[in-house]
Amino acid sequence: MAYLKIVLVALMLVVAVSAMRLSDQEDQDISVAKRAACKCDDDGPDIRSATLTGTVDLGSCNEGWEKCASFYTILADCCRRPRG
């Protein structure tokens, strides 16, 4: 009898969790910004007055982009398209 109760409770939990899941469209509407602006080395000394010309890329810079900041992070790089 105890096993039957455990099975019923487990089934109820599975139904409750699956009913609360968001549909795929709602998942796509909740998006996280994948890129943000960052300060390249030649943007100026002050972060408040500098124009942020770089873009934060997770991992490393995309193909055709260059790393524009001298500092090193494991998770992301400050990158921009080559000038010219």
From Swiss-Prot:
Removed propeptide positions: 20-33, 84
Localization annotation: Secreted; Nematocyst
One of the record's GO molecular function terms: toxin activity
Cellular component terms per the entry's GO annotation: extracellular region; nematocyst
Pfam family, one: Toxin_4
Keyword terms: Cleavage on pair of basic residues, Disulfide bond, Ion channel impairing toxin, Nematocyst, Neurotoxin, Secreted, Signal, Toxin, Voltage-gated sodium channel impairing toxin
Segment forming the signal sequence: 1-19
Disulfide bonds: C38-C78, C40-C68, C61-C79
Tagged with keyword Signal: yes
Role: Binds specifically to voltage-gated sodium channels (Nav), thereby delaying their inactivation during signal transduction.
Family: Belongs to the sea anemone sodium channel inhibitory toxin family. Type II subfamily.
Protein name: Delta-stichotoxin-Sgt3a
